[in-house]
Amino acid sequence: MSQAEFDKAAEEVKHLKTKPADEEMLFIYSHYKQATVGDINTERPGMLDFKGKAKWDAWNELKGTSKEDAMKAYIDKVEELKKKYGI
Protein backbone atom coordinates (compact mmCIF):
# COMPACT_ATOMS: atom_id res chain seq x y z
CA MET A 1 0.00 0.00 0.00
CA SER A 2 1.44 3.32 -1.06
CA GLN A 3 0.36 6.90 -1.59
CA ALA A 4 0.33 6.20 -5.34
CA GLU A 5 -2.06 3.25 -4.87
CA PHE A 6 -4.29 5.41 -2.69
CA ASP A 7 -4.30 8.24 -5.24
CA LYS A 8 -5.12 5.77 -8.02
CA ALA A 9 -8.03 4.33 -6.01
CA ALA A 10 -9.31 7.85 -5.27
CA GLU A 11 -9.38 8.55 -9.01
CA GLU A 12 -10.90 5.19 -9.95
CA VAL A 13 -13.81 5.52 -7.52
CA LYS A 14 -14.96 8.57 -9.51
CA HIS A 15 -15.35 6.42 -12.63
CA LEU A 16 -17.52 3.57 -11.37
CA LYS A 17 -20.30 2.69 -13.83
CA THR A 18 -22.96 2.85 -11.12
CA LYS A 19 -23.11 5.10 -8.06
CA PRO A 20 -22.46 3.00 -4.94
CA ALA A 21 -25.05 2.74 -2.17
CA ASP A 22 -25.10 5.50 0.45
CA GLU A 23 -23.46 3.25 3.07
CA GLU A 24 -20.65 2.44 0.66
CA MET A 25 -20.18 6.12 -0.13
CA LEU A 26 -20.01 6.96 3.59
CA PHE A 27 -17.30 4.31 4.01
CA ILE A 28 -15.34 5.79 1.09
CA TYR A 29 -15.78 9.36 2.36
CA SER A 30 -14.85 8.65 5.97
CA HIS A 31 -11.78 6.58 5.14
CA TYR A 32 -10.60 9.15 2.59
CA LYS A 33 -10.89 11.92 5.18
CA GLN A 34 -9.14 9.85 7.87
CA ALA A 35 -6.31 9.02 5.45
CA THR A 36 -5.85 12.59 4.22
CA VAL A 37 -6.77 14.74 7.24
CA GLY A 38 -6.57 12.42 10.24
CA ASP A 39 -8.95 12.60 13.18
CA ILE A 40 -12.03 14.74 12.65
CA ASN A 41 -11.35 18.40 13.32
CA THR A 42 -14.73 20.07 12.82
CA GLU A 43 -17.91 20.55 14.81
CA ARG A 44 -20.87 18.24 14.12
CA PRO A 45 -23.27 19.83 11.61
CA GLY A 46 -26.63 21.20 12.69
CA MET A 47 -29.72 19.15 13.35
CA LEU A 48 -31.28 19.67 9.89
CA ASP A 49 -28.14 18.80 7.92
CA PHE A 50 -28.84 15.08 7.71
CA LYS A 51 -26.26 14.32 5.01
CA GLY A 52 -23.59 16.38 6.78
CA LYS A 53 -24.30 14.65 10.09
CA ALA A 54 -24.08 11.19 8.48
CA LYS A 55 -20.72 12.06 6.92
CA TRP A 56 -19.44 13.60 10.17
CA ASP A 57 -20.55 10.57 12.22
CA ALA A 58 -18.92 8.12 9.80
CA TRP A 59 -15.62 10.02 9.93
CA ASN A 60 -15.83 10.45 13.71
CA GLU A 61 -16.15 6.66 14.14
CA LEU A 62 -12.62 6.34 12.71
CA LYS A 63 -11.04 8.57 15.35
CA GLY A 64 -7.67 7.08 16.30
CA THR A 65 -7.34 5.03 13.09
CA SER A 66 -3.91 5.45 11.54
CA LYS A 67 -3.46 7.02 8.12
CA GLU A 68 -2.04 3.74 6.82
CA ASP A 69 -4.96 1.65 8.09
CA ALA A 70 -7.47 4.11 6.61
CA MET A 71 -5.64 4.08 3.27
CA LYS A 72 -5.58 0.27 3.16
CA ALA A 73 -9.29 0.00 4.00
CA TYR A 74 -10.06 2.65 1.36
CA ILE A 75 -8.05 0.87 -1.35
CA ASP A 76 -9.60 -2.51 -0.46
CA LYS A 77 -13.12 -1.03 -0.60
CA VAL A 78 -12.50 0.62 -3.97
CA GLU A 79 -11.27 -2.71 -5.36
CA GLU A 80 -14.45 -4.36 -4.04
CA LEU A 81 -16.63 -1.63 -5.60
CA LYS A 82 -14.83 -1.93 -8.95
CA LYS A 83 -15.73 -5.63 -9.04
CA LYS A 84 -19.31 -4.92 -7.98
CA TYR A 85 -20.10 -1.91 -10.19
CA GLY A 86 -17.46 -1.94 -12.93
CA ILE A 87 -15.28 0.91 -14.06
UniProtKB/Swiss-Prot annotation:
GO molecular function: fatty-acyl-CoA binding
Record's keyword terms, sorted: Acetylation, Endoplasmic reticulum, Golgi apparatus, Hydroxylation, Lipid-binding, Phosphoprotein, Transport
UniProt modified residues of type Phosphotyrosine: Y29
Chain positions found as N6-(2-hydroxyisobutyryl)lysine: K55
Domain of life: Eukaryota
Modified residues (N6-succinyllysine): K8, K17, K55, K77
Record-level GO cellular component terms: endoplasmic reticulum; Golgi apparatus
Record PTM N6-acetyllysine, positions in chain: K8, K19, K51, K55, K77
ACB domain residues: 2-87
Major location (coarse): endoplasmic reticulum
Keyword Transport in record: yes
Modified residues (N6-malonyllysine): K55
Function in brief: Binds medium- and long-chain acyl-CoA esters with very high affinity and may function as an intracellular carrier of acyl-CoA esters. It is also able to displace diazepam from the benzodiazepine (BZD) recognition site located on the GABA type A receptor. It is therefore possible that this protein also acts as a neuropeptide to modulate the action of the GABA receptor.
Protein's recorded name: Acyl-CoA-binding protein
